[in-house]
């Protein structure tokens, strides 16, 4: 059973500490994945103002966020300027590339995108993508081939903005199957590879403890579905690293074979069905996100 393995890298600490550990774990398991990197300033601590929202406050309590992520991540970019991730830690991104993993853009400013993508102008959306693409392509030494919107904050405007960058595919939404979004002019856009499996932080809480997560998530894979799983360098690369190592071992025993997302694309991309990305909601995740329709 083939499955896509996606690793989102949102923060400075996730890049500095989580990525090297994940690369070692993946090398041990002989597994390749897709890394989506945030490359601009780490301003993730600015999400703390969202604690006034009951859904976000409950998510932080449910996942025990301070223990899960660490205070340096939760406070990054609040009382001081956010550290420039790509400028300081670009060699770790090249290390992932040299190890044979697929590399794509997550965001220039992860917090900025997640907080503002829903109301930025078309020009602002394009400028944010442009900054991220320019930075990551300079780091890698070649064009960026894929992207994944931070926090799955994507809709048809985001889809349209990304068309100018010539990506091979995007992974901007939650959904159940590969598709090509229908654009405003009636043409079909860049292929989308949705995520169909929940993330660790979406399901951990009073009814599911961390040590039971592997049983839960491995039970969600099925032969007749997409099977795209997302992990975070800030979680599975740090505090839950041992759990991820065991997940890979058990997945292999169950016949689940992980691969970079790009390997899920068919040879004839033009034959993929059409679809849309609309704003929706998902249990365990605060705020809106892009969903396949």
Curated annotation (Swiss-Prot):
One of its GO terms (biological process) is response to antibiotic. Gene3D superfamilies: Glycoside hydrolase/deacetylase. Keywords: Antibiotic resistance, Hydrolase, Lipid A biosynthesis, Lipid biosynthesis, Lipid metabolism, Lipopolysaccharide biosynthesis. Pathway: Glycolipid biosynthesis; 4-amino-4-deoxy-alpha-L-arabinose undecaprenyl phosphate biosynthesis; 4-amino-4-deoxy-alpha-L-arabinose undecaprenyl phosphate from UDP-4-deoxy-4-formamido-beta-L-arabinose and undecaprenyl phosphate: step 2/2; Bacterial outer membrane biogenesis; lipopolysaccharide biosynthesis. Signal peptide: none annotated. It comes from the Bacteria. One of its GO terms (molecular function) is hydrolase activity, acting on carbon-nitrogen (but not peptide) bonds, in linear amides. Residues 1-259 form the NodB homology domain. GO terms for cellular component: membrane. Its EC number is 3.5.1.n3. Catalyzes the deformylation of 4-deoxy-4-formamido-L-arabinose-phosphoundecaprenol to 4-amino-4-deoxy-L-arabinose-phosphoundecaprenol. The modified arabinose is attached to lipid A and is required for resistance to polymyxin and cationic antimicrobial peptides. Belongs to the polysaccharide deacetylase family. ArnD deformylase subfamily. This is Probable 4-deoxy-4-formamido-L-arabinose-phosphoundecaprenol deformylase ArnD.
């Amino acid at each position: 059973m083939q499955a896509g393995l996606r690793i989102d890298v949102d923060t400075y600490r996730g890049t500095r500490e989580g990525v090297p550990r994940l690369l070692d774990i993946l090398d041990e398991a002989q597994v390749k994945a897709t890394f989506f990197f945030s490359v601009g300033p780490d301003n993730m601590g600015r999400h703390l103002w969202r604690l006034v929202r009951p859904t976000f406050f409950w998510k932080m309590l449910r996942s025990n966020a301070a223990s899960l992520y660490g205070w340096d991540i939760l406070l990054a970019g609040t009382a001081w300027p956010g550290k420039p991730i790509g400028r300081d830690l670009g060699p770790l991104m090249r290390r992932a590339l040299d190890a044979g993993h697929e590399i794509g853009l997550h965001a220039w400013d992860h917090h900025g995108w997640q907080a503002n993508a829903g109301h930025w102008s078309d020009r602002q959306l394009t400028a944010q993508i442009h900054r991220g693409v320019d930075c990551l392509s300079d780091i890698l030494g070649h064009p960026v081939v894929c992207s994944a919107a931070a926090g799955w904050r994507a809709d048809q405007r985001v889809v349209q903005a990304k068309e100018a960058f010539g990506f091979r595919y995007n992974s901007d939404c939650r959904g159940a199957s590969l598709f090509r979004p229908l654009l405003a002019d009636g043409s079909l856009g860049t292929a989308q590879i949705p995520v169909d499996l929940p993330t660790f932080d979406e399901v951990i809480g009073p009814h599911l403890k961390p040590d039971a997560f592997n049983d839960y998530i491995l039970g969600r894979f099925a032969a007749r579905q997409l099977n795209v799983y997302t992990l975070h360098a800030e979680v599975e690369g740090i505090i839950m690293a041992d759990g991820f190592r065991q997940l890979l071992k058990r997945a292999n025993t169950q016949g689940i074979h992980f691969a970079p997302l790009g390997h899920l694309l068919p040879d004839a991309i033009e034959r993929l069905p059409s679809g849309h990305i609309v704003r929706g909601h998902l249990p365990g995740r605060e705020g809106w996100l892009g969903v396949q329709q």
